[in-house]
């Protein structure tokens, strides 16, 4: 078995497809706590366009609306799954040790100890620094004594962070980022939400520091898929694939601090919680989020606004507030892009989507 695997491509979809293909051809099978899995050792995934993050793989059941919502939740710094996250991910409580929080939620850990702000400050001060990093792993939370103290003797945690640390460097005046991952599911983690949320973070840091966006890589010690989901892997590999490009549209932020960044995303999530609880309707949510964009200097025509609009409409549609073709939804997103195709192929079918040309 090859002890090292390097997979490099333009975007997430192409890289994930290549990873699944290689695992299917050369991966090793083993039994583990979640059933049998086929895995590759020491996989270095690398993409040259982090904006090409929107997953579009035929045969793969993926909901772009859920990915966007979870990423906003991560960036809000929350670990609480009630009210908001479980609306999008009904299975979220299955991974909670107390039924309320995810023990390994990335948001609280990334913002802890002022890590993100420290990284931003270092990068602005010295573009040659090698000290810009963010730790997700935390022995004070994840060691056996810490787990026992938090949840009781003999407790086996349901959620220990797979992603452990983030390295950020400036290479040729571009902000490049690498994430170290101990273990990654190529269908539901390392091949799905993880590259989406971390390239999203990378772009936020790029805009906060003023550097152009560089490449992204994620290094996975054990990249695998489970036997229970092998049919879905086979469906992906048998299907004809088009790896759609990204249109290059930036998020459109320039947060002056990590605190402002967290405040903004927490504010947007609070609006959505009100919408989910039917305290406000679609129109009120739309205008409240517009106000937040204005207050924090986020461009109303940037990709972040497209993402926010998607979630706002998704909530309204799930609650039956809108039906049929909704022509106002993201008319500036071409169908021949990764995001346009991610929306069109989403399994969520409660409303039609009409995009731009």
UniProtKB/Swiss-Prot annotation:
Swiss-Prot/TrEMBL induction comment: Hydroxymethylase appears immediately after infection.
Catalysed reaction, written as an equation: dUMP + (6R)-5,10-methylene-5,6,7,8-tetrahydrofolate + H2O = 5-hydroxymethyl-dUMP + (6S)-5,6,7,8-tetrahydrofolate
Keyword Methyltransferase tagged: yes
Position of the signal peptide: none
One GO BP: symbiont-mediated suppression of host innate immune response
SUPFAM superfamilies: Thymidylate synthase/dCMP hydroxymethylase
Enzyme Commission number: 2.1.2.-
GO molecular function: methyltransferase activity
One Pfam entry name: Thymidylat_synt
Similarity field: Belongs to the thymidylate synthase family.
Its job: Catalyzes formation of 5-hydroxymethyldeoxyuridylate (5HMdUMP) as a step in the pathway that replaces dTMP by thymidine hypermodifications in the viral genome. As a final result of the pathway of hypermodification, 5-Nalpha-putrescinylthymidine (Nalpha-PutT) substitutes for about 50% of thymidines in the viral DNA. These modifications probably prevent degradation of viral genome by the host restriction-modification antiviral defense system.
Protein name according to UniProt: Deoxyuridylate hydroxymethyltransferase
Organism (species): Delftia phage PhiW-14
């Amino acid at each position: 078995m090859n002890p090292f695997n390097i997979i490099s491509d333009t975007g997430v979809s192409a890289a994930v497809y290549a990873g699944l293909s290689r695992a299917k051809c050369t991966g090793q099978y083993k039994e583990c706590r979640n059933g049998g899995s086929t895995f590759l050792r020491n996989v270095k995934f690398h993409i040259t366009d982090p904006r090409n993050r929107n997953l579009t793989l035929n045969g793969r059941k993926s909901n772009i609306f859920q990915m966007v919502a979870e990423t906003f939740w991560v960036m809000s710094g929350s670990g609480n799954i009630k009210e908001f996250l479980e609306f999008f991910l009904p299975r979220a409580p299955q991974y909670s040790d107390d039924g309320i929080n995810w023990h390994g939620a990335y948001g609280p850990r990334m913002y802890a100890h002022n890590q993100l702000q420290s990284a931003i400050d270092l990068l602005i001060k010295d573009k040659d620094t090698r000290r810009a990093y963010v730790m997700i792993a935390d022995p004070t939370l994840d060691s056996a004594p810490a787990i026992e103290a938090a949840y009781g003797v003999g407790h086996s945690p349901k959620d220990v962070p797979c992603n452990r640390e983030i390295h950020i460097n400036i290479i040729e005046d571009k902000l490049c980022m690498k994430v170290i991952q101990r273990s990654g599911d190529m269908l539901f983690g390392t091949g799905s939400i993880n590259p989406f949320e971390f390239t999203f973070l990378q772009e936020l840091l790029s805009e906060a520091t003023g550097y152009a966006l560089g490449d992204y890589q994620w290094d996975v010690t054990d990249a695998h898929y489970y036997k229970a989901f092998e049919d879905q892997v086979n469906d992906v590999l048998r299907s004809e694939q088009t790896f759609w490009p990204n249109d290059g549209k930036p998020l459109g932020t320039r947060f002056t601090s990590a605190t402002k960044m967290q405040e903004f995303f927490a504010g947007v999530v609070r609006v959505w919680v009100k919408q989910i609880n039917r305290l406000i309707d679609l129109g009120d949510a739309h205008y409240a989020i517009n106000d937040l964009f204005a207050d924090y200097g986020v461009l109303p025509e940037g990709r972040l606004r497209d993402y926010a609009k998607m979630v706002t409409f998704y909530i309204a549609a799930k609650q039956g507030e809108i039906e049929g073709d909704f022509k106002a939804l993201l008319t500036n997103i071409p169908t021949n892009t990764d995001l346009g195709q991610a929306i069109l192929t989403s399994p969520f079918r409660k409303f039609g989507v009409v995009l731009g040309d």
